[in-house]
Design a protein with these regions (language model features):
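N-terminal acidic leader/helix
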Residues: 1-32
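Short, charge-rich amphipathic interface segments used for partner binding and complex assembly
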Residues: 25-65
Length: 65
């Protein structure tokens, strides 16, 4: 693991099933670049933690987009 997004997710209270959904979506966008995938996962989690976005909104946008 390059970025410790799991600790950030736990700190933010993101349940494991939703973290799994987020990681699957992001990894599909960056299948060959682990660093970019983890960076985008972490950025999404930090946006939720800071109140800039809700996890449901992020998951909805990613699925729709």
């Amino acid at each position: 693991m390059i970025f410790d997004y799991k600790t950030a997710a736990a700190r933010t209270g993101i349940p494991g099933d939703k973290l799994d959904r987020l990681t699957a979506i992001v990894r599909a966008e960056f299948p060959d670049d682990e660093m970019m995938a983890e960076l985008h996962i972490l950025r999404a989690i930090l946006a939720v933690e800071q109140g800039a976005a809700s996890l449901e909104d992020i998951l909805r946008q990613e699925v729709a987009g």
